[in-house]
């Protein structure tokens, strides 16, 4: 897979690309991440990538010419990180990971000239109902979520148990020591009984989702076991 990221601040991606899972995925060839400096497509003396908005108002707007030119040199679905976009989630990530190439425009200032959005952008995505200084962090979040779903980047079992992957929040995790400052790990996790452990994890996943994100439960078609466990949870949480 190839991910192109168009940005005015390419150095912001140095750490993102050189550490942890993303760095390993790049090293063994699961993904190529191409950081494109939008100013490389600004040909005036000052490399100006933004200008004042027509009609007046605060802030600056990213100019159309550099973005149109930069987009001529990439392919694949074009995503624009924008507060006006659809909220990015795990289901969208599972669809985007099927693409061979993606291009993400990291917006900045008051955003990009609308002609770019109308003529070049396939999808506007937001990572939440809040405002960032620029779209670089959103581009990293979207890229990270997609890359970890690529084959062999991490074990399939690892991401399938993540929050949201199966429509539920993740269950609690514990590691050694089994007791610390009189705080004990749940006995079932030490039992070696994998059937009971799996059921405990499902129940705690349901519990967290029920208590913290109840709408996910309401939109889910529950299995017979999930219904049974949820009934138990409701009685326990009264």
Swiss-Prot record:
In the record, what terms sit under GO molecular function? Answer: tRNA (guanine(37)-N1)-methyltransferase activity
Task: Look up the record and report any one GO term of the cellular component aspect.
Answer: cytosol
Record InterPro entries: Alpha/beta_knot_MTases, tRNA_m1G_MeTrfase_C_sf, tRNA_m1G_MeTrfase_TrmD, tRNA_m1G_MTases_N, tRNA_MeTrfase_TRMD/TRM10
Its keywords, alphabetically, are: Cytoplasm, Methyltransferase, S-adenosyl-L-methionine, Transferase, tRNA processing
Q: Which SUPFAM superfamilies match?
A: alpha/beta knot (SSF75217)
Catalytic reactions of this protein: guanosine(37) in tRNA + S-adenosyl-L-methionine = N(1)-methylguanosine(37) in tRNA + S-adenosyl-L-homocysteine + H(+)
Q: Which CDD domains match?
A: TrmD-like
Give the source's domain of life in one word.
Bacteria
Q: Where in the cell is it found?
A: Cytoplasm
Which positions in this protein are listed as binding S-adenosyl-L-methionine?
107, 127-132
Keyword Nucleotide-binding in the entry? The reply is: no
Any one Pfam family match given in the protein's UniProt record, by short name: tRNA_m1G_MT
GO terms in the biological process aspect are: tRNA N1-guanine methylation
User: EC annotation?
Assistant: 2.1.1.228
Q: Which family does it belong to?
A: Belongs to the RNA methyltransferase TrmD family.
Q: Which HAMAP family match?
A: TrmD (MF_00605)
Q: What does this protein do?
A: Specifically methylates guanosine-37 in various tRNAs.
Complex and partners: Homodimer.
Question: This protein is called what?
Answer: tRNA (guanine-N(1)-)-methyltransferase
Q: Tell me the lineage of the source organism.
A: Bacteria, Fusobacteriati, Fusobacteriota, Fusobacteriia, Fusobacteriales
């Amino acid at each position: 897979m190839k991910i192109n990221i168009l940005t005015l601040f390419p150095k912001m991606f140095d750490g993102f690309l050189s550490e942890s899972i993303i760095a390993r995925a790049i090293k063994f060839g699961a993904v190529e991440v191409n950081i494109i400096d939008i100013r490389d497509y600004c040909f005036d003396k000052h490399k100006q990538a933004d200008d004042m908005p027509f009609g007046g108002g605060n802030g600056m707007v990213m100019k159309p010419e550099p973005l149109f030119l930069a987009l001529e040199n990439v392919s694949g679905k074009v995503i624009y990180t924008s507060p006006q976009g659809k909220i990015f989630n795990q289901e969208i990530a599972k669809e985007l990971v099927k693409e061979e190439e993606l291009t993400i425009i990291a917006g900045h200032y008051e955003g990009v000239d609308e002609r770019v959005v109308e003529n070049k952008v396939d999808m506007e995505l937001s990572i939440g109902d809040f405002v960032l200084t620029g779209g670089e962090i959103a581009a990293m979040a979207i890229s990270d979520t997609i890359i970890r779903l690529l084959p062999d980047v991490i074990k399939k079992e690892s991401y399938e148990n993540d929050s949201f992957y199966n429509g539920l929040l993740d269950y609690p995790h514990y590691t050694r020591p089994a007791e610390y400052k009189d705080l004990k790990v749940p006995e079932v996790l030490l039992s070696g009984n994998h059937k009971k452990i799996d059921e405990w994890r499902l129940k705690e996943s349901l519990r967290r989702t029920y208590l913290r994100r109840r709408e996910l439960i309401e939109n889910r078609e529950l299995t017979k076991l999930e219904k049974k466990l949820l009934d138990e949870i409701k009685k326990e949480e009264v």
